[in-house]
């Protein structure tokens, strides 16, 4: 569809209104749900747990854009020892994604979550239960224990809580990133630089909520 000047102006204005509403909803959601976003005991924190800036990532192990962005997140915490990276499973791409998210969360007590998380993104092909358990076994995790504990109500509850939180924040898809109290576009191109710039901005201007 080709728009005339008036039509184009109307479309741009409508997009601006929608964007403003989305941003306003997210900012309200962040203020109301800061504790769940930044300090939920069910979310794994990589990097420096006591860091001065929180970066939050909502992701699905079968999301190609999440896969592309994962190295930038790893690079960020490797290069900045004061960043705390809060990882939130948000499986939206089917049963495989949900099962793998459950396995990943069940690995936290065994102390190998981050290694499993990174391998799930670096190994080619779709993330499935079989692949997740194979990787877990290669990392020395007790897979029988994983299969049992992934069914615990706390694991399913953590995923349900992430879904509810995402809805409250107006998250419309994955990946979804936040640095401090503001969203960062999930586009893979330039993600690392965008994260670094936003981290620097938070350090300079602070965060409107307890991040």
Predicted regions and their residues:
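Short beta-strand-to-loop junctions in surface cap/lid or active-site-entrance loops
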Residues: 43-51
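C-terminal cap of thioredoxin/glutaredoxin-like
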Residues: 1-18, 134-211
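Structural alpha/beta surface segment adjacent to cysteine/selenocysteine redox centers
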Residues: 51-62, 67-137, 142, 147, ...
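Conserved strand-loop elements at the edges of beta-sheets that form or border functional pockets
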Residues: 48, 57, 186
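Ser/Thr/Pro/Gly-rich low-complexity linker/stalk segments immediately outside membranes or between
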Residues: 19-35
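Hydrophobic alpha-helical segments typical of transmembrane helices
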Residues: 41-42, 72, 131, 162
């Amino acid at each position: 569809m080709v728009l005339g000047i008036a039509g184009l102006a109307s479309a741009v204005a409508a997009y601006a209104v929608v964007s403003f509403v989305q941003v306003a909803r997210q900012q309200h959601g962040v203020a109301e749900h800061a504790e769940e976003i930044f300090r939920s005991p069910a979310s794994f924190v990589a990097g420096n747990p006591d860091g001065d800036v929180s970066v939050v990532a909502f992701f699905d192990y079968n999301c190609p854009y999440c896969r592309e962005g994962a190295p930038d997140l790893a690079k960020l915490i490797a290069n900045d020892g004061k960043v705390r990276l809060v990882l939130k499973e948000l499986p939206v791409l089917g049963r495989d994604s949900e099962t793998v998210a459950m396995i990943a969360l069940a690995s936290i007590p065994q102390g190998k979550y981050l290694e499993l998380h990174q391998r799930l993104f670096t190994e080619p092909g779709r993330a499935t239960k079989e692949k997740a358990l194979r990787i877990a076994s290669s990392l020395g995790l007790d897979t029988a224990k994983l299969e049992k504990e992934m069914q615990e109500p706390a694991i399913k509850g953590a995923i349900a809580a992430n879904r509810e939180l995402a809805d409250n924040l107006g998250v419309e898809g994955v990946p979804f990133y936040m640095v401090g109290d503001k969203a960062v576009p999930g586009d893979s191109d330039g993600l690392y630089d965008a994260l670094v710039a936003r981290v620097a901005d938070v350090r300079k201007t602070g965060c409107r909520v307890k991040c």
